[in-house]
Amino acid sequence: MPLTNTPETLNILNPDFRMPEHCGGDRWSILHGDSLQILRQFEPNSFDAIITDPPYASGGSSQTTKSRSTNEKYSSMSKEKALPDFDSDQMDQLSWMFWTAAWLQDARRIAKPGAPVCLFIDWRQLPAMTLALQWAGWTWRGVAVWDKVASRPQKGRFRQQSEYIVWGSNGKMPLERNVGCLPGVFRYPNPQNRIHVTEKPLQLMRDVVQICEPGGRILDPFAGAGTTVLAAVQEGYEAVGIEMSDAYFQRSAERLKTALESEVNQN
């Protein structure tokens, strides 16, 4: 099926909402805008899972180090090769917790009963994320690990080679869901040729989205490079992403078009 600019997934938005800039195709869409504004425009019970890699507002133990650009905090690329920075990553911890709880509360309203939520985070913000999740009314169910396999060695210290997936559900989560047993540790190196500063490996996300029941609709409120949306579509789901950055909206839309058009042509 050819890609279009008016995917059916956008029918779950409030009909009175002025449609933001968007791009999409068969079973996917990316909306350009602020998640705090757009999340409130979806109809209740619209999504079977919320899976996202939000801004961590981390990268240091002091406000001075946290206030650096995302490239300075999370990338070792030279200035000539640096990727675009992204917003909402310079908050102090209390502000970040309130902001995170706010969008998670909006996300819970539009998630179906029992829908899983998966949130990537680093070790510094791990405790705060578990609190924000519960403040927003979700049931916290555990933490999975992304083992990045390698990281910069530090003499006399443990390697910081892991990030975490805080996960939970919108209330009770029936054991009879049509989902298999998923691992608690995912081992994948950082992707090469990234288009986003904190891009996650595609195969990692293809594994993680399988927490959703087959054929469900997945929301990523912080789409970034579009990896979650791409992984979801490749695994047979519908997916909606939201991205505030002009640069990353364009990059993710182009990536999805290219990847999914290629798959359509091959089939």
Q: Predicted segment positions?
A:
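Short hydrophobic/aromatic beta-strand or adjacent loop that forms the aromatic wall/cage
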Residues: Q161-I165
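S-adenosyl-L-methionine-dependent nucleic acid methyltransferase catalytic domains
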Residues: M1-A150, G156, Q160, K172-P174, ...
